[in-house]
Amino acid sequence: HPFVNHPFEVRDDEDMQKLVDSIKENGVLTNLTVRPRAEGGYEIISGHRRFHAAQLAGLDKIKVQVRDVDDDQAIIDMVDANIQREHISPMEKARAYAMRLEAVKHQGRRTDLTSDQLGPKLTAAEKVAAGVQDTQTQVKRYIRLNSLVPDLQKK
């Protein structure tokens, strides 16, 4: 099953066709990352494009790595796996960063995950910016795009 509210669009474009051709020739080289769903089945955390391409290539089975993670960690993992991709629209980044920010804030309540006795405590926005190519200021600006009226978000 796809990730609920997945902010990254899976496009049937030239890049997708190249991925389909590669999968037909070589198979899926990187496993999808999934997690068990309470109602049964699995939810894709990372690999939506590979999954779609595998379907287009006619595969009925694909290898996965199963991770038992909570909602917040699943969001963080999903954003981290996708944010470095090329051809991500500003709105995709905006939605992804906003989702990651909320997940990081939730984890901030769990001191076992965020307390560091030796170093300074990072803000949630600093944690979102860590490990991505955008600065903390850029991350905040992207997140503000979510406040645009829906018609402007589509442009």
Can you annotate each of these PLM segments?
Residues 59-60, 68, 103, 145:
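A short linear boundary/processing microfeature
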Residues 1-67, 73-87:
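Short, charged/polar connector segments at secondary-structure boundaries
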Residues 11-18, 48-49, 70, 74, ...:
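Charged, alpha-helix-enriched surfaces in structured cytosolic catalytic cores
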Residues 85-155:
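Alpha-helical interaction elements
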